[in-house]
Amino acid sequence: MQSHLAPLACAAAAGRAGGSCQAAQPEDRRVLRYPGTAVMVTCPNRPLVPRPLLTPGGSRASLALCAFVAVPQRIPQPLLPAYILLMLPSLVVDMALPSSRLLRSIKPIQPASQVVRKERNPNPNCPQSDPLMKASSTSFLSHTYLINKTRSTTRKVEEHSWFTCTGAKYFAIPLAERNTKRLTKRSTHAQLLRGKQDGSEWVVPRSSASSNVLYH
């Protein structure tokens, strides 16, 4: 049901961004079917909605439509048109306001297959046993998203592909493997790996080098 709305969202996003609308790829539709994974995007006057909306090239505006596309699973099919009409005015307002908090809070996103490696200031003195050395050998995205850290708070998650020994920056990828339940500090506290960067504390689940997530 959600994937049927993706073309509509894409068209509206293209109009807002001044670009053209491209149909979602099969892997994008696969991601759309898993509401428990991917990014949590803050939508005004609505709860946090997990939805990556991976259009080719990673449209920022299409991400902004997450709340409109992520139709609650419990809505019966006959009521879907009424839900769309109910959400449409709010959607138009969100997209029309240049200062919309929805648009300001979202940055571009790339499909996992287009991940790029950007490593800065590597420290050659790091011991090879340092887990960060192992993690740094993987390619990572370099964008900022909003992740639901607890039920009532939203924190920034910033992704990096570089590190230092004394002030380590950690990683958050791949996008499709992120599980919002696993991103909760409360549930992963015993597995956290702590580090310091620029005077701030960063915490990372110790699960694997390809899915480390940092909290700020």
From Swiss-Prot:
Keyword match Secreted: yes
Tissue specificity note: Ubiquitously expressed with higher expression in heart.
Localisation per UniProt entry: Secreted
Signal peptide bounds: 1-23
GO CC terms in record: extracellular region
Highest taxon of the lineage: Eukaryota
Keyword Glycoprotein: yes
Keywords: Glycoprotein, Secreted, Signal
Residues bearing attached sugar chains per UniProt: 148
Main localization of the protein described in the UniProt heading: secreted
Protein name stated in the entry: Putative cat eye syndrome critical region protein 9
Originating organism: Homo sapiens
